[in-house]
Amino acid sequence: GDFLHMVRNYSFGKVSICRVHYALNEAPDFLNGEEMSQTAFQRIFGSVADIDRQYQEIAAGIAPTNPFLWTACWTTKDPSRAPDGKHTLIMDTFVPNQLSNGERWEDIKEDYVQNVLLRKLQEYTSNMTESNILGQYIDTAESLARDNLSLVNGTTAGGERTLSQSGYFRPFPSYAHYHSPIRNLYMTGPSCHPGGGISAMGTITANVMLEDLGF
């Protein structure tokens, strides 16, 4: 009874991401030099005030107008991820999983990526032009929820990272050690400690299972 009550009251939150996967001719050429261009991933934002404004917009269900960016061009470190001489780029930002004006992310995703996310990246790079982009695929809250059952409502962290859902309390009090109430059934994934985006939950759960089996 207590376990079911905790499950029903678990909060996944209302924050998702808008993510675009690019196939590129060239890796992004950042204006502040080769060292940045050869770094595998970047965090891009204007100011702390801009970040505050973005979270206010997310709370209000508004698509962020001047978002910070997370970009990763893993092919600068691992060329095998793309055909010879080509590159890939992932770029995303936090957004509300549902828009307060009734629009669907699936309907506005191309416009938002082109006119907000890409335009922001172009402020910091010299070559993120139309001729450099070979193709793209865009993930939204809807596609994330459809493709991965752990991403409930398109939220990517496996549940809110509030104090009541962190550390010893993730996912529930007394259940932070990857055991479920059912014997020999274990829990893993982003809803378990340490949470989505940090990884290692599968490895930790596997080690717990091996320890229980006497290995």
How would you name each of these model-derived features?
Residues 100, 126, 211-214:
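A generic secondary-structure boundary signal that marks alpha-helix termini
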Residues 65-72, 127-193:
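A glycine-rich dinucleotide-binding beta-alpha-beta segment and adjacent secondary-structure elements
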Residues 33, 102, 198-199:
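Short, glycine/acidic-enriched capping/hinge loops at junctions between secondary-structure elements
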